[in-house]
Amino acid sequence: MKELKIEQWPVERLRPYGRELKVTDKALPQMVDALRQWGFRIPLLVTGDGEIVDGKTRYRAALELRMETVPVIVA
């Protein structure tokens, strides 16, 4: 079994999954506020080449906040 570890990756290394789900108008501002207040509580789940499997709203909120790096778990 592969050991999972949290890494910090630059946001420009990431890209949303091909079949994007729509982020609701309410979800993004709420996530921006949560990241601003508490930071990342749950890392993004990404593939080795940076495709986001889980965490698109967190990713978009990080872009809004102009974060340079985000925590990820590589699946």
Where are these regions (language model features)?
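Short, charged/polar connector segments at secondary-structure boundaries
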Residues: M1-A75
